[in-house]
UniProtKB/Swiss-Prot annotation:
This is Argininosuccinate synthase. The gene is argG. The lineage of its organism: Bacteria, Pseudomonadati, Pseudomonadota, Betaproteobacteria, Neisseriales. Keywords: Amino-acid biosynthesis, Arginine biosynthesis, ATP-binding, Cytoplasm, Ligase, Nucleotide-binding. One of its GO terms (biological process) is urea cycle. It comes from the Bacteria. L-citrulline binds at residues 90, 95, 126, 130, 181, 190, 266, 278. SUPFAM superfamilies: Adenine nucleotide alpha hydrolases-like (SSF52402), Argininosuccinate synthetase, C-terminal domain (SSF69864). It comes from Laribacter hongkongensis (strain HLHK9).
Amino acid sequence: MHEVKKVVLAYSGGLDTSVILKWLQDTYQCEVVTFTADIGQGEEVEPARKKALALGIKPENIFIDDLREEFVRDFVFPMFRANAVYEGEYLLGTSIARPLIAKRQIEIANMVGAEAVSHGATGKGNDQVRFELGYYALKPEVKVIAPWREWDLLSREKLLAYAETHGIDISKRKSGASPYSMDANLLHISYEGLALENPAAEPEEDMWLWSNSPEAAPDEAEYIELEYSQGDIVAVNGMAMSPAQVLTRLNQLGGKHGIGRLDIVENRYVGMKSRGCYETPGGTIMLKAHRAIESITLDREVAHLKDELMPKYAKLIYTGYWWAPERRMLQAMIDESQKTVNGWVRLKLYKGNVIVVGRESKTDSLFDPAIATFDEDGGAYNHADAAGFIRLNALRMRIAANARQRRG
């Protein structure tokens, strides 16, 4: 166990990773480097520095990085160019954050000369797969330490007892029952555990932190306009914004109007079904708007091909294959399709609904009113051409019908 000299730990400052930090020191007798990512989880990250210092980590071995812009620009936006949705509903808020954390962890390991990395994902979940596939894709020889697969601290009570024995601050946990297991970033917040483990039980209203209920949302609709450049939102209501600013603003607007709540049972990669609740207000708006601008700027067959490939792309992200060659290949194709996705979309937000009320692309629209009109089109479309088109497309079915008749 003592062959590891230095390990980079993905460290949140919470109970689990604080226990892991101490456990790594005691079990591996190694130097621990902590890495805390700010990806918009809404919590102060500086307390993680204080906790790490209190647990004996050298100041130069504490890394706290603001990755919000990189997260949205290089991970969230590319995913939304694909309209990625897992199993018809899940917008992949947790899944898409893991490859960025893994990437930065490996970068730090290379900087400090660490031969190992560690994470706090449990042995039952998807995150262990997502983290470790990323590690191995970016640093094939790295040693991965996954404490939840090694130690015997397999209950919350054992973790708390270990923390108290080793003087780890657990003040946030002393007030009573454990809270829901939550994970947050700029794209979403998720809730699991406790009463949610009964899929028949409706979540309590006070569980939801980011959004009003549709019933409590404003009675007056709000209109917004999003501007697109090559498939990405670059302005909200005429105001140019960075990627992280765009998502932050859309989260505010969506949460205000009760948009983006989701309660699903999903199929985990490790084989079990799991119930989770999610709030993705900004992402829900983005998905609806992106499909709207694509509807007038993408060729029909390109749009249909994207829709056919999207479930595969979404599954790759869900199961941790962001860094795999097949995901890169699909991304290159998707990004090629987005070169013409320019223009604006107008939306109405009202009590949990995102309603498209207008879309326009002055440079790349494939919508031709002269051809699409139900009125006189001046000869732009010859109705007589449809007869031959229909007969040719019906040919195989006519042949099959004749064969059935011959068989009797």
